[in-house]
């Protein structure tokens, strides 16, 4: 399907700025899609203005009430500047370095929860320290663990002990990370005690989880940095790894939360390099953005996806250091 954004008028946009057709079409897709959206435009194509316009329109049209834009740490100020360049009258909240940790972070998250912002721009590293509730984390982890246990059973049934061991090791690592982050969440709850009540007048809850922020739209800039999501599979080839980066598991939890609350179509990833090392990265992008579509097509499991859309080919390659094959 092709999306035509020529109908969009962008009320409130700065006079003298006209978005290109590809930017308008991307915004139209984000606003109309029933799944998450990957904006895989090349470097220099204007993904920042695309993201700003999409979030602002989603807020204006009522598709979202609390859009959040997650960007690399050094780009928060630039994103805020670009947002106000495109929408001079916008009411945005942008995270500074002082807001990134400790009491500064507690105050910032409380402002996010209490304010009516057109958009909130946050630093990547601070975003990944704000988790969904421990109860939800444990529930989501149980789902992923079940997928891995199924793959372990498959591997052991065909005598693939190597793949089975890798999957078991990854489950152990994920359980360790889960236990650590749950304990950290409990400590955070004590540390930010009172911040949310002061701004919300809510005397019942003494901590802030991601769910408390009211976020119902996520725009992830430089999304290729979240490609290392654990893959439950017995396929053992370069580029397909069962290991996961914790920040990727955390983002997946937040995407699952948005889907669970009916906002899965408000997940937007932007990157100029959607594939850098392996085609398996495309599978992970689809898991973040459109897992229901994968299930509907019968390719939710990586093995099914790989057999449907790819093939394993043996070839000779030069070593990265260039000294052999």
Enumerate the language-model features and the residues they cover.
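Conserved pre-motif I regulatory segment
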Residues: 2-40, 226
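Conserved SF1/SF2 helicase motif Ia
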Residues: 38, 42-45, 50-81, 87-91, ...
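Catalytic acidic motif of RecA-like/P-loop NTPases
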Residues: 44, 125-126, 224-231, 274
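Loop/turn-to-beta-strand initiation segments
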Residues: 65-66, 116-119, 214-216, 263-268
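Conserved P-loop NTPase motor "coupling/switch" region that bridges the ATPase
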Residues: 85, 89-92, 96-98, 142-182, ...
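Conserved helicase motor
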Residues: 94-105, 123-129
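Conserved motor-coupling elements within RecA-like helicase/translocase cores
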Residues: 102-120
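Coupling/switch/interface segments within P-loop NTPase motor domains and analogous charged loops
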Residues: 116, 120, 126-215, 219
């Amino acid at each position: 399907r092709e999306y035509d954004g020529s109908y969009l008028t962008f009320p409130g946009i700065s006079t003298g700025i006209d978005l290109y057709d590809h930017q308008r079409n991307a915004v139209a897709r984000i606003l109309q899609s029933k799944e998450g959206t990957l904006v895989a435009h090349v470097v220099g194509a204007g993904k920042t203005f695309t993201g700003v316009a999409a979030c602002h329109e989603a807020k204006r049209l009522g598709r979202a009430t609390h859009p959040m834009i997650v960007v690399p740490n050094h780009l928060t100020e630039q994103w805020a500047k670009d947002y106000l360049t495109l929408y001079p009258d916008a009411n945005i909240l942008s995270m500074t370095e002082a807001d990134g940790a400790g009491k500064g972070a507690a105050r910032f998250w409380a402002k996010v929860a209490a304010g009516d912002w057109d958009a909130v721009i946050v630093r990547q590293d601070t975003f990944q320290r704000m988790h969904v509730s421990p109860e939800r984390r444990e529930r989501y982890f149980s789902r992923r663990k079940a997928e891995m246990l199924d793959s372990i059973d498959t591997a052991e049934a065909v005598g693939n002990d190597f793949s089975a061991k890798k999957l078991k090791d990854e489950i152990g690592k994920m359980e360790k990370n889960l236990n650590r982050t749950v304990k950290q969440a409990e400590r955070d709850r004590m540390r930010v005690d009172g911040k949310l009540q002061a701004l919300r007048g809510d005397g019942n809850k003494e901590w802030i989880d991601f769910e408390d922020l009211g976020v119902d739209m996520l725009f992830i800039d430089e999304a290729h940095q979240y490609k290392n999501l654990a893959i439950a599979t017995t396929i053992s080839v370069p580029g397909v790894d069962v290991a996961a980066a914790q920040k990727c598991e955390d983002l997946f939890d937040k995407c699952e939360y948005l889907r669970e609350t009916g906002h899965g179509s408000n997940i937007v990833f932007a990157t100029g390099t959607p594939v850098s090392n392996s085609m398996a990265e495309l599978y992970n992008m689809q898991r973040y953005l459109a897992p229901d579509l994968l299930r509907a097509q019968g390719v939710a499991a990586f093995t099914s996806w790989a057999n449907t859309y790819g093939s394993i080919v043996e070839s000779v390659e030069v070593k990265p250091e260039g000294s052999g094959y």
